[in-house]
Regions:
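Conserved glycine-rich beta-strand-loop-beta hairpin in the small C-terminal domain of fold type I
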Residues: 370-380, 391-405
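Conserved core of the PLP fold type I
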Residues: 138-273, 278, 284-300, 372, ...
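Short beta-strand "wing" residues that participate in macromolecule-binding interfaces
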Residues: 57-58, 166, 426
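Conserved core segment of the aminotransferase class I/II
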Residues: 124, 301-370
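Short Gly/Ser/Thr- and Asp/Glu-enriched loop/turn motifs at secondary-structure junctions
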Residues: 61, 168, 395-399
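AMP-binding (ANL) adenylation modules
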Residues: 432-436
Length: 470
């Protein structure tokens, strides 16, 4: 975090604590500069950031004042999906989303990429170079099928933060969380099996289920507490469900952290109905609370929770490193990995291992938690300012996604097509539902820095939504 960001955070905390009251004049630029031992330009940048966040307002020749408090947009209500098994479609829309990744002229508000421009990632660049220069023969050869042991040992230590006690021998490395989840499903399911999912559910997971020939049943999900335990139990009574996919920590796209009591309740249901829990923890390290939230896997005593994660969101997607703790399905999963993809890339494993071992990983993740939290606050302010009344916005407890529910008459599928012509990519809510629900919703990627350029995009998005309401 830069000096001006640190100062802005400090001032924001003082405002939230009531030390500076709404309408009160803030200290002058010069006095703050002297108080904190920073330059005048640093104070000016901090005030500009707080102005962007609509926490303060400038008055000509008078200085800065604390802005009047504005009401937060309400949180969306619990989802109400169709509760019956369905086959997934919408591949064409997803393919359009994926193609936009490679077009540098498109602004990817609908994507899921993290911010890989931060200086705290410089050590991983050095480690990648070093891995190739000093281990040439090693990086050109096959690796262990389960993945490099040193990296598995480092990951096992990281998992302790989420309450999971495992050893390197309990883990299998993959080419990402998507790959880990796919292998987990292959190890347990047969084509035609039914898998329960949260609703809304990440579209990549939906398309994975489609590709494996599986049916899905969407379960109502609360944007603050997670999947409805009662609705899941009802579905388990009615249908031969094989397992449930959950993102309980910093959920994508809703951003909630499921309370511990509800995590244990889901695990109790899984034990009673003898189903598998496929736990996706890819965003868990990006929780704003500390210590980070526990995984469902941390309470598992009979190996029925298959925990999947990766460095895709915390370090960089280009590393292509994920992992899975497959529990009782270890042997089957290793067989599936050999059949599907074989071994991992040695060079990126070496680099990631050293990045963690030397302490760079924790420093980087701490930095990104703060940046993403501040980004989401700014984007929420922009939504309040540039979008019509009547919207609902999630209040994520981590990660970097916002889920926005718009008035019923807005069709974000049509709006997204119009924005595409303006070189703006949006992710309509219908992508996150097997039944095509949530057409009046949109997911926004707040990993994109809140620059003037991206502010202008939010203005255009708000204008397009207003036109769609006419």
């Amino acid at each position: 975090m830069t000096r001006y960001q640190h100062l802005a955070t400090l001032l924001a905390e003082r405002i939230e604590q009531g030390l500076y009251r709404h309408g009160e004049k803030l200290p002058s630029v010069r006095s703050l500069s002297q108080e904190h031992g920073v330059s005048i330009s640093t104070v000016q940048q901090a005030y500009q950031l707080l102005e962007q966040q609509q926490m303060i307002v400038p008055q000509p020749r008078s200085g800065y004042f604390v802005a009047p408090r504005k009401a937060q947009p309400p949180v969306p209500p619990m989802s109400r999906p169709v509760q019956r098994p369905v086959e997934i479609t919408q591949w064409d829309q997803v393919l359009t989303m994926l193609d936009a990744r490679y077009d540098k002229s498109i602004i990817p508000f609908g994507g899921g990429s993290p911010d890989v421009t931060q200086p705290s990632l410089k050590p991983i660049w050095r480690e990648l170079s070093r891995a190739i220069q000093h281990n040439l023969t090693e990086v050109l050869n096959y690796d262990e099928l389960a993945g490099r042991r040193e990296l598995r040992e480092q990951i096992a230590r990281l998992m302790l933060d989420g309450g999971s006690v495992v050893t390197a021998d309990d883990l299998v490395l993959t080419s990402g969380c998507h790959s880990a989840l796919s292998l987990a499903l292959l190890s347990v399911c047969q084509p035609g099996d039914i898998i329960a999912v949260e609703s809304p559910c990440y579209y990549g997971t939906m398309q994975m289920l489609r590709g494996l020939g599986l049916k899905t049943i969407e379960i109502p999900t609360d944007p603050e507490t997670g999947i409805s335990i009662e609705a899941l139990e009802l579905a388990l009574d009615q249908w031969p469900i094989k397992g449930v996919i959950l993102v309980p920590n910093c959920n994508n796209p809703l951003g909630f952290i499921m309370p511990d009591a509800r995590k244990r309740a889901v695990l109790n249901l899984a034990q009673r109905y003898d189903i598998v829990i496929f736990e996706d923890d890819i965003y868990g390290e990006l929780a704003t609370e500390y210590p980070r939230p526990r995984t469902i896997h941390s309470w598992d005593i009979d190996g029925r929770v298959m925990l999947c994660s990766s460095f895709t969101k915390t370090i960089a997607p280009g590393l292509r490193i994920g992992w899975i703790a497959p529990g009782r399905y270890y042997d089957k999963l290793l067989q599936m990995k050999y059949a599907a993809s074989g071994t991992n890339v040695p060079s990126t494993q070496l680099a990631a291992c050293n990045f963690i071992r030397e302490g760079h990983y924790h420093r980087h993740v701490r930095r990104m938690r703060q940046i993403y939290q501040r980004n989401m606050e700014i984007y929420t302010c922009w939504l309040r300012e540039f979008f019509p009344c009547g919207i609902c916005v999630t209040r994520p407890k981590g990660g970097f996604m916002l889920w926005v529910e718009l008035p019923e008459q807005v069709d974000m599928v049509c709006v997204a097509k119009q924005l595409c012509r303006l070189k703006i990519q949006a992710a309509p809510g219908s992508l996150f539902s097997a039944a095509g629900k949530y057409r009046n919703c949109v997911r926004i990627n707040c990993a994109l820095p809140p620059t003037e350029k991206h502010k202008a995009v939010m203005v255009k998005l708000g204008e397009a939504v207003k036109v769609a309401m006419e």
